[in-house]
Amino acid sequence: QVSSAASDVYKRQVLFLLGILYYGVDDDGQQFRYLGVLQRIAVCYLFGGLLFLNFRWRGLLLSSVLLLGSYWALMSFVEVPGHGAANWEVGTNLAHYIDTQYLGGYKWSGDWDPEGLLSTMPAIVSGILGIFGGMLLKNPNLTGSMRAIWILAIGGACLGGGYWWDAYASLDYN
């Protein structure tokens, strides 16, 4: 399992470096973009893969709940220096503050970047949801129709949960 973890890390490093090579430098060649889509995929794939190698489905579920709960708590309760109380508004929230203070380089759109540091937490959970889907599809104890029923039921529950959760933590991409 050590070689599998080492291989997992190596593949993600290559993907991260490809993202830096592709997205890394602005048009003037003066500033560097540290995080982009490929880098985000590499980070999520790395953490998801390492969690998958070390935990069963309950550990993955607990990791997902902890990541989303921590993200929500940070965004909802941590005061943003220079902007006052915690908020979810683009440009004044904690994720933007952390990216501005610690990420450096140029951003995707002015002073904002959708692939930031703090916002990677829920993105990792999206990767873990994909792992759950793969685990369900590869389960030898389920027939094809039972897999379809489970996927529809879980998808419906996630949609309902997301609709309910939107009242507490809005889903903003822009």
Where is each model-derived feature located?
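Single conserved hydrophobic/aromatic residue that forms the stacking wall/gate
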Residues: 1-6, 10
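Membrane-interface helix caps and helix-loop-helix hairpins in membrane proteins
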Residues: 24-34, 82, 167-174
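Membrane-embedded alpha-helical segments of multi-pass membrane proteins
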Residues: 34-46, 121-129
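Membrane-interfacial entry segments at the cytosolic side of transmembrane helices
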Residues: 55-65, 142-150
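Long hydrophobic alpha-helical segments that form multi-pass transmembrane helix bundles
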Residues: 57-127
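Long, well-ordered mid-to-C-terminal structural blocks that present hydrophobic/aromatic surfaces
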Residues: 132-174
